[in-house]
């Protein structure tokens, strides 16, 4: 039986998006498609899709996204278990909703609701 909350997306964020794109394309031959000035979609060919982006206010990090039925309800549960909302909820272009939270040790994890491509 499939797990009800699969990991559906990953993100690699750093200061220089183009440098990261060139690195991962060169190392893994990933297909990379820019969608915004600061962000590109990554299609590795098999497995889950992801993104590479630039965020000046953050140190480099990797985030994965977990599919949930209701982002707001998931954030409430997370906070009741000792996590903290980091950002969102916010809509994304394909109609989904995303948010981020920090686990009890400060790891940033994403949530996604209703995104067809994720």
Each language-model region and where it sits:
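N-terminal beta-strand motif that seeds the catalytic metal site of vicinal oxygen chelate
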Residues: 1-21, 62-64, 114-118
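Conserved active-site tyrosine of GNAT-family acetyltransferases
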Residues: 20-24, 78, 106
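Conserved short beta-strand elements that form part of the metal-binding/catalytic scaffold
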Residues: 28-62, 108-113
């Amino acid at each position: 039986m499939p797990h009800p909350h699969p990991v559906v997306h990953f993100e690699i964020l750093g200061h220089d998006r183009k440098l990261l794109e060139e690195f991962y394309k060169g190392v893994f031959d990933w297909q990379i498609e820019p969608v915004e000035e600061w962000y590109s979609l990554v299609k590795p060919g098999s497995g889950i899709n992801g993104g590479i982006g630039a965020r000046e206010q953050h140190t480099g990090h990797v985030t994965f996204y977990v599919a949930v039925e209701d982002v707001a309800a998931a954030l409430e549960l997370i906070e009741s278990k000792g996590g903290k909302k980091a950002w969102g909820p916010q809509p994304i272009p394909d109609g989904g909703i995303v948010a981020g939270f920090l686990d009890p040790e400060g790891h940033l994890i994403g949530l996604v609701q209703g995104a067809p491509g994720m």
